[in-house]
């Protein structure tokens, strides 16, 4: 369900969306935990601002941009359709990415995954520690704002690590199905970790929801 929901959300954001009156309106998803539930690793102030302000802004701007796009589509205004693509990508990606991110975290998270996901990580990266080191390095190394990702390559049947700039969505950018995303925009950590991104990366492993990531993996590899 998780993968299908993410993939279908991505499809709804595309230019081919229906121009009928039943247009989909995106909404801010509720968090599956309280804003302070991830403390001391991610404090409540960060979570509240990140969810209720930053993510909400992506949702609102996405709805406005899609409305303008549908109007341009109805008028056959190709120039405006093209001009709106960056805003669709940025705000649509921000909505997709954060909707995954919140479920990737849990106050009962941390440790290591189990079962099929752990075996796949060992197969594709050598060990869980090597995987953790690689995803950490890729995430820390993102220049400016962006995301570090663990994704599934459906064609090759293996896990891959990738970085995406800004709010570029993983699947729309690389073709990889997103399993685990780490937000390295400064709004995700600056109020607590200042400019020390590596400390934020070290902390976030304590709240990774491996049950959620594993469920995504099982669904997406079918």
Swiss-Prot record:
Modified residue N6-acetyllysine is at which positions? Answer: 68, 75, 114, 122, 130, 202
Keyword Manganese among record annotations: yes
Where are the 3'-nitrotyrosine residues found in this chain?
A: 58
Mention any one GO cellular component term assigned to this protein in its UniProt record. Answer: mitochondrial nucleoid
Note on cofactor: Binds 1 Mn(2+) ion per subunit.
Q: Which reaction does it catalyse?
A: 2 superoxide + 2 H(+) = H2O2 + O2
For activity, the cofactor(s) needed are: Mn(2+)
One Gene Ontology term of the molecular function aspect:
enzyme binding
Q: State what protein this is by name.
A: Superoxide dismutase [Mn], mitochondrial
